[in-house]
Design a protein with these regions (language model features):
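Catalytic cores of nucleotide-sugar-dependent glycosyltransferases that transfer UDP/GDP/TDP-activated
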Residues: 1-450
Length: 450
């Protein structure tokens, strides 16, 4: 099968989990024997060899589009540059800049497909998230491609109709303001999202496409998130933890780590900080250590640093981006990873942690509750703990319970987590299901079936 993938992020260009997902899907499909081609904006990165160039009319200007081609782990990647496509601000500059980039990406994708169509006529077009709506619409319009649209996280924004007019998609603009996710889902032959629970939680949207909507769980690359690859693999886990804490100026203790974006609307950092406040009055607090790692909302960053100043023996704030290799060392050393999200379409942190033996304590939402088996519900097969979202008291109570778990239970949680991540959530399984989606051979989400 010849498969064309559209994405605004593709490794090594990334902002969050989207790049990991799109790259893993493309490489996984290639590993299954399919011919996979990716179109992505350059975002100012000159990767690969010059392939072709052409001019595109957009926003009253003629833009010189340059295309570079590279092979990356069996996948052919075309980076489209020129004009705003070269802006290093992946989702910008600004809202207007992002929309202009998305429109230009759509038009440039048609130009590139014109160059390729003699040798590469995709059996399916797989577009990821709303930024690809113009490319999806135009490639369907001019080449009649069967298409799948995957929503990794609903954005719920509206786009002024003039951008669709600029993209030569007048037929898709019945209103002055357009929901690009609704439009992409409407024109696609199939719609997917990344977990069953998220699909049901957002049924007000996904239910509009009943009959062609389903879920495909994301996966995890356990060849990278692997305890055998960490530098301290020959040391007992307790010694790894002690060294990490010593490097941060902390005494040994049970470690609870948060790592992710400081996103006030989603990630629940404020819930964690309130839980730490509650724990500070509990006798268990003296033996608890909290690593809070991430960047984003300035107020949350300031609050996190204030907590470190207030509890210097217990809390460390790291408000910078860490390499994947450093994060892997942390997962292989800490005891627990805290994921207090308000919502989570799928989430990767819990599976990365499980691969490396860190036990997740997470909100019972979306993909988190689909991937984590809760200790209180199924002690024998449990892989972590689930708590209600936005409930600092429940989170604090779970962390106290976690701290007091005996070694046998902790080891069972770790081994169960490693097994579940590797066997049930591989990218190979995800890609096999995507192939069934492409061929229309997959179960559908239906309102009267649960």
């Amino acid at each position: 099968m010849q498969i064309l993938i559209l994405g605004f992020e593709y490794l090594p260009v990334k902002v969050g989990g989207l790049a990991e997902a799109v790259t893993s899907i493309a490489e996984g499909l290639s590993n299954l024997g399919h011919e996979v081609v990716v179109f992505t904006p350059s975002h100012g990165k000159e990767m690969g060899e010059p392939f072709t160039s052409f001019r595109v009319s957009a926003f009253g200007e003629r833009v010189d589009v340059t295309v570079r081609k590279r092979e990356q782990n069996g996948v052919i990647v075309y980076s489209l540059g020129g004009g705003v496509l070269d802006s290093p601000d992946i989702y910008g500059p600004g809202w207007d800049g992002l929309l202009r980039k998305a429109v230009l990406f759509g038009k440039a994708s048609v130009g590139l497909m014109n160059k390729l169509i003699g040798e590469f006529k995709p059996d399916v077009l797989h577009a990821h998230d709303w930024h690809t709506v113009f490319a999806l619409g135009l490639l369907r319009k001019y080449f009649g491609l069967r298409s799948v649209f995957t929503i990794h996280r609903l954005n719920k924004a509206k786009v002024p109709a003039r951008y669709f007019h600029e993209a030569n998609l007048d037929e898709l603009v019945p209103y002055p303001d357009i929901d690009p996710e609704h439009t992409a889902a409407y024109i696609a032959d199939a719609v997917t999202t990344v977990s069953r629970s998220y699909l049901l939680e957002e049924w007000d949207f996904f239910g509009l496409f009943e009959g062609k909507v389903t879920h495909v769980f994301n996966g995890i690359d356990c060849s990278f998130w692997n305890e055998d690859l960490i530098e301290t693999r020959d040391l007992p886990r307790e010694e790894r933890r002690r060294r990490i804490l010593e490097n941060l100026g902390l005494r040994d203790g049970k470690v609870f780590m948060f790592i992710g974006r400081f996103d006030r609307a989603q990630k629940g950092v404020d819930t964690l900080l309130r839980a730490i406040e509650l724990l500070s009055t509990d006798p268990s607090f003296s033996d608890m250590r909290f690593l809070i790692i991430g960047k984003g909302d300035p107020e949350l960053e300031a609050w996190t640093r204030a907590m470190e100043n207030r509890f210097p023996e217990n809390v460390r704030a790291i408000t910078k981006l860490l390499s994947r290799e450093v994060v892997r060392e942390l997962y292989g050393s800490v005891d627990f990873v805290v994921i207090p999200s308000y919502f989570e379409p799928f989430g990767l942190v819990q599976l990365e942690a499980m691969c490396l033996g860190a036990v997740p304590i997470a909100s019972a939402v979306g993909g988190l509750k689909d991937t984590i088996i809760d200790l209180s519900s199924d002690p024998e097969h449990a892989t972590g703990m689930l708590v209600p979202p936005r409930d600092a008291f429940a989170l604090a109570s779970a962390m106290i319970w976690a701290k007091e778990l005996d070694d046998e239970t902790l080891e069972r949680l770790r081994e169960n987590g490693k097994k579940r991540a590797r066997e049930d959530f591989s990218w190979e399984k995800a890609c096999e299901r995507y192939v069934r989606v492409y061929g229309g051979r997959v179960d559908k989400a239906v309102s009267f079936l649960r």
